[in-house]
C-alpha cells in the first residue's frame, strides 16, 4: 500500500471511533476539534469547513497545504460557503468582482433518514469555465428531499488565482485542480464522522466541474479516493479545458497589474504575490475581447514533470491510451444543444441590432476565441479553418437570427459533443472499468441560454445545464419543475445514489440500464427524453 493509501486508511479508522454525537447530530468531532452544523428540518448541514490553509500571502500560487489549525472553541459550521474570488460572468454591471481569496472549504449536507445509519457520498465539483461559479450556486433541496446520499460541495481556486501558469516549475499552474484533489482526500479521511461511507464516494461535476472530474480520474491512484466518477457536459478533451498559450497569458497578466519588469517566471510569481488578489482577478476583463469571450482565458495546463505536486504532466489522450489512470466506472453526458451556453449571447438585442450581426465582419477575428484554437494554429491556418467551419455549417448564409441554429450546432459540436465522443472512444478502447454515456433532449422552460440572450421568444432547444439543474437547483431556472421534470429529477438523483453504492459499477436511469462501452464496436448511448429513456447504438454521436 502506498503512502496516500496508508494515511487514508489510518484516518478512516481514527474517525470511525470519533463519529458525531448520537444525542446531538449537529455536533461532530474532527481532528481539528468539534464543529456544530445546522438543522434544516429534513436534513443537516455542515458548511464552510476548511480543508486547506488559506491560499493567501506566501501560499498564493502554491499547491494547497492541508488545514492544520486546531479549534479551541466549537467551530461554527452554519455559514454559507463564500465564492472563491472571481470575475463572474453572471454578475450584472461593469464590476463583476465577487468572492474571497480565502475560500478553500467543503460543505456537507446529510439527509434525515431513520432507515439508514450511514450513507453513500456524492462529492460535487461546481462548473463555471474554471473562471467563476460557487458551491452555493448549486442547490441541494432536491437531493435532500430524496434522502439517498450525503452531498459534499467542494470550493476551489478559480481564474488566474487557480490556473495562471508559466509552464515551468516556478509557476506550474493547476492550483484549482490540486485544491480539488486535497478536498477529495479530506472527504475520504473525514466523511465517516458525518455518517458517510468513505468506501462509497462518487465524484461528479458539470461543465468545468465535469472536466475536473475527468482530470482527477486521470490520476492512477484516483480509485483510492472515489469508487466512480460522473462527468456531465464536460470532459478532459473539450478544447477549452487543457489549453496552450498559458505562459504568454501569465506574463500578460503581469503586465496588466504592473509586473512588466519581470524577466522570468520566478520574478513574475514574486511580483504577482505582492499584488492584491482583487487587482489580479479584475485583470481578467483585459483578456475578454467580446462580452465574456473567451469564456475560459485561464484553465488547466500541462505541467512540467519536475513541477512540485504536479497533477497533469501528459496530454489526457496519452494518459488514457497508457491505461495508467483511475480504472473506476465512469459516465459522461451531453445535451443536444450544449453549445447554446456559448452562442446564446449572440442573440442579445441592442439598439443597433442583434449581437450576431457583428460576426459578419468579425468572424475570422472572433472564431478562434469562441472555439479555442487561437494558440494552436498559425494566423493563416486559423483563418482557413474559420472559413471552412462556417461553410460546413452555414454554407453561404450570413450570420443572423435565421442561421443562428446552425451556429449553435457548430458550437455544440466543437466545444462539447465531438470531444465527448472522442473521450468515450478512448475509454472503450483502453479502459478496463465500465464507461457509460447518455444524451439528454428535453428543453427547460427557462435555462442558461435565455438568461444570456435576455430573451424568451427563441427556442434554443435543450441547452447546457437543462439536465443538471434538475438535480441541483440553479438561479437560471426561476420556474417550478414540470411534472415530467420532477420524474426526471428523481430518476437522476436515484441514479447517482445507486452508482455511489454499487459494488459492480452498474448504472441505471429509471427502468433503463446503461450499457458498457468498453470493448464495444459501436457507441452505447442512453437517450433520455421527456417521457422515458432508450438504449441506442451509434457509429457516431447523433
Swiss-Prot record:
Entry protein name: Esterase 6
Organism from which the protein derives: Drosophila simulans
PANTHER family: CARBOXYLIC ESTER HYDROLASE
Range of residues in the leader sequence: 1-19
Reaction(s) this enzyme catalyzes, per UniProt: a carboxylic ester + H2O = an alcohol + a carboxylate + H(+)
GO molecular function, one term: carboxylesterase activity
Keywords attached to this entry: Disulfide bond, Glycoprotein, Hydrolase, Secreted, Serine esterase, Signal
Residues modified by glycosylation: 40, 418, 454
Family: Belongs to the type-B carboxylesterase/lipase family.
Active site: 207 (acyl-ester intermediate), 464 (charge relay system)
Stated role: Transferred from the ejaculatory bulbs of males to the female genitals upon copulation, plays an important role in the reproductive biology.
Gene: Est-6
The UniProt record lists the keyword Magnesium: no
Amino acid at each position: 500500500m502506498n503512502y496516500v493509501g496508508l494515511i487514508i486508511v489510518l484516518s478512516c479508522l481514527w474517525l470511525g471511533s470519533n463519529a458525531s454525537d448520537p444525542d446531538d447530530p449537529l455536533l461532530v468531532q474532527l481532528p481539528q476539534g468539534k464543529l456544530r452544523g445546522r438543522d434544516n428540518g429534513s436534513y443537516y448541514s455542515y458548511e464552510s469547513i476548511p480543508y486547506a490553509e488559506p491560499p493567501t500571502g506566501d501560499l498564493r500560487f502554491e499547491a494547497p497545504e492541508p488545514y492544520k489549525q486546531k479549534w479551541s472553541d466549537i467551530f461554527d459550521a452554519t455559514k454559507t460557503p463564500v465564492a472563491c474570488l472571481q470575475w463572474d460572468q453572471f454578475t450584472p454591471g461593469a464590476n463583476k468582482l465577487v468572492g474571497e481569496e480565502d475560500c478553500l472549504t467543503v460543505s456537507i449536507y446529510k439527509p434525515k433518514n431513520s432507515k439508514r445509519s450511514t450513507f453513500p457520498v456524492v462529492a460535487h465539483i461546481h462548473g463555471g469555465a474554471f473562471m467563476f461559479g460557487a458551491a452555493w450556486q448549486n442547490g441541494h433541496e432536491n437531493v435532500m428531499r430524496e434522502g439517498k446520499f450525503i452531498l459534499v460541495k467542494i470550493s476551489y481556486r478559480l481564474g488566474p488565482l487557480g490556473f495562471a501558469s508559466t509552464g515551468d516549475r516556478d509557476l506550474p499552474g493547476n492550483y484549482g485542480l490540486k485544491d480539488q484533489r486535497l478536498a477529495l482526500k479530506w472527504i475520504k479521511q473525514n466523511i465517516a464522522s458525518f455518517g458517510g461511507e468513505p468506501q462509497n464516494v462518487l465524484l461528479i461535476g458539470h461543465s468545468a466541474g465535469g472536466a475536473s472530474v475527468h482530470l482527477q480520474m486521470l490520476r492512477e491512484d484516483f480509485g483510492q479516493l472515489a469508487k466512480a466518477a460522473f462527468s456531465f457536459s464536460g470532459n478532459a478533451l473539450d478544447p477549452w479545458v487543457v489549453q496552450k498559450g498559458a505562459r504568454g497569458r501569465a506574463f500578460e497578466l503581469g503586465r496588466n497589474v504592473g509586473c512588466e519588469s519581470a524577466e522570468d517566471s520566478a520574478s513574475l510569481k514574486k511580483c504577482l504575490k505582492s499584488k492584491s488578489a482583487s487587482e489580479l482577478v479584475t485583470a481578467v476583463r483585459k483578456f475578454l475581447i467580446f462580452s465574456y469571450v473567451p469564456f475560459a482565458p485561464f484553465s488547466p495546463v500541462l505541467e512540467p514533470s519536475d513541477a512540485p505536486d504536479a497533477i497533469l504532466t501528459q496530454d489526457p489522450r496519452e494518459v488514457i491510451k497508457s491505461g495508467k489512470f483511475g480504472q473506476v466506472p465512469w459516465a459522461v453526458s451531453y445535451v443536444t444543444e450544449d453549445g447554446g451556453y456559448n452562442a446564446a449571447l449572440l442573440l442579445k438585442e441592442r439598439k443597433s441590432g442583434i449581437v450576431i450581426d457583428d460576426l459578419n465582419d468579425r468572424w475570422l477575428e472572433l472564431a478562434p476565441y469562441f472555439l479555442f484554437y487561437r494558440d494552436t494554429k498559425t494566423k493563416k491556418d486559423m483563418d482557413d479553418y474559420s472559413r471552412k467551419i462556417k461553410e460546413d455549417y452555414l454554407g453561404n448564409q450570413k450570420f443572423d437570427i435565421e442561421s443562428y441554429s446552425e451556429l449553435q450546432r457548430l458550437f455544440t459540436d466543437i466545444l462539447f459533443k465531438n470531444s465527448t465522443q472522442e473521450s468515450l472512444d478512448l475509454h472503450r478502447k483502453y479502459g478496463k472499468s465500465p464507461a457509460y454515456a447518455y444524451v439528454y433532449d428535453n428543453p427547460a422552460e427557462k435555462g442558461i441560454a435565455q438568461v444570456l440572450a435576455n430573451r424568451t421568444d427563441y427556442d434554443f432547444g435543450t441547452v447546457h445545464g437543462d439536465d443538471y439543474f434538475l438535480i441541483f437547483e440553479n438561479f437560471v431556472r426561476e420556474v417550478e419543475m414540470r411534472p415530467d421534470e420532477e420524474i426526471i429529477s428523481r430518476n437522476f438523483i436515484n441514479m447517482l445514489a445507486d452508482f455511489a453504492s454499487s459494488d459492480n459499477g452498474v448504472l441505471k436511469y429509471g427502468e433503463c440500464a446503461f450499457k458498457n462501452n468498453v470493448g464495444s464496436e459501436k457507441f452505447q448511448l442512453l437517450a433520455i427524453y421527456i417521457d422515458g429513456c432508450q438504449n441506442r447504438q451509434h457509429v457516431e454521436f447523433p
